[in-house]
Amino acid sequence: MSSNFIRRAVCSACVAALFAAGAAAAPAAPRVLPGTMPADIAAALERVRLPRDALVAVVQEVGDASPRWTWRADTPANPASLMKLLTTFAALDLLGPAWTWTTPVWLHGSVAGGVLDGDLVIKGSGDPKLVMERVWLLLRRVQQLGVREIYGDIVLDRSAFSAPNLTQTQTQTQTQTPTPTPADFDAEPLRPYNVRADALLLNYQSLVFTLLPDPARGVALVSVDPPLAGLRVTPSVPLGAGPCADWRAALKADFSDPDAPKFAGTYALGCAEKSWPIAYAEPKNYAARVLSGIWQQLGGRLTGTVRDGSAPATPPTFVATSPALADVVRDTNKFSNNVMAQQLFLTLALTQRGSGSAELAREVLADWAQARLGSAASGLVIDNGSGLSRETRLSANLLAQLLQRAWSSPVMPELMSSLPVSGVDGTLKRSRATLGRAHLKTGSLRDVSGVAGYVLGDSGRRYVVVAIVNHPNAAAARPALFDALVQWAANDAELARLAP
């Protein structure tokens, strides 16, 4: 066992011990009788018109075998983005916080006089953070190696992840199944949360339109990043009178032509600079157009095309390295980034089974959950690792045991610091509950809402808190119900008041 791992384990144990020591003098909060519900939580459910059987929940002190309160804790529920806790903890546990993705690059040919007589080959391995700045640096590195003109093609190797439409049924029957598209989940293909995983995922396959008012000219200037080759954008829109209300609707955007997005409306004079991220309408062509666009922006020339292909068997000319896994996990959980979670999910299959398929990723995650959580993992249904699914199922007890396990693990600091902090950042920035004292992952879909993480009590004790609502009115649970639950967990110095 490495000395670094031992130091990390000792450090994590010390942190946990300090938390425990700080709470040692405080009496344990009273436990709620089985089958009863704290009055504050019952009242919150009634206020938002949610039935009690829509909720599954656990509140449990860290390190304590007995929960302070449970409600239908073993009932399987759709967790929405709370599923990311399972994926990110498994990734940290199996790969380590310092693990990185590598993107090898080949100058496959001879270089002379600023010309590469051959192909530029880039092989993806699932890096979730090949954002515009890093793509720019990658191509700048190519130029630093003496290449200004590519007398050949830019070849993209995406083979690390298996094609999602090749199913066992299709192989057996030889019938064609529809290729999954970003519109499949909720018919909103331009929403960035619907972007699909890709072994060579560039800039989350998204565009960001920026609108900057210029009152002197009576227009708002429109710009777009990253630069896509061949993309034609309306350079400005007229300024309109009035306050900045639903500015997106007022723009009357038309994204039906991926090559020429249009804005037929106006932009309110009362609006400051605004950004509008969208998923690119033709994801299969996105990488090619981004690479062509940035290469041209750098002054480079390409005589051939950008196409898919295979990387050479020879060692690469250089390798681009991603940020550490801990940084990726932080972005994934703080901002509930679906495509980053799916990249992690398939990376687990690639690293643990040698092939980046969804089937193998489900196998890896299920095996890991069984090994770490035992019987609590029963009833677990895994789909894509992000929670953007109607099929995923797990229990509140599973998430509670997962968080207990994480608390005592060497990667506890990385996982906990990746969670949004109440009233401070991420998806909890607007939360009004226990400012700065709750680290909670949030989750929401149509008919689903949930929170799971850690809450610091008034006594100095820390609690695992899990709550999921599955109901057509689930959206009403945030913030009223979850704020009430978090506040109740934090108020552990008071006697529990039970609902009748």
Where are the language model's segments positioned?
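Residue-level preference for non-acidic, small/hydrophobic
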Residues: 65, 84-91, 154, 200, ...
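Conserved serine DD-peptidase/penicillin-binding transpeptidase domain
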Residues: 26-45, 94-377, 491-494, 498
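Small-residue-rich helix-loop
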Residues: 68-70, 345-500
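Bacterial N-terminal signal peptides that target proteins for export
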Residues: 2-13
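Short beta-strand scaffold segments in enzyme catalytic cores
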Residues: 57-60, 103-105, 452
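Short active-site loop at a secondary-structure junction
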Residues: 70-90, 94-95
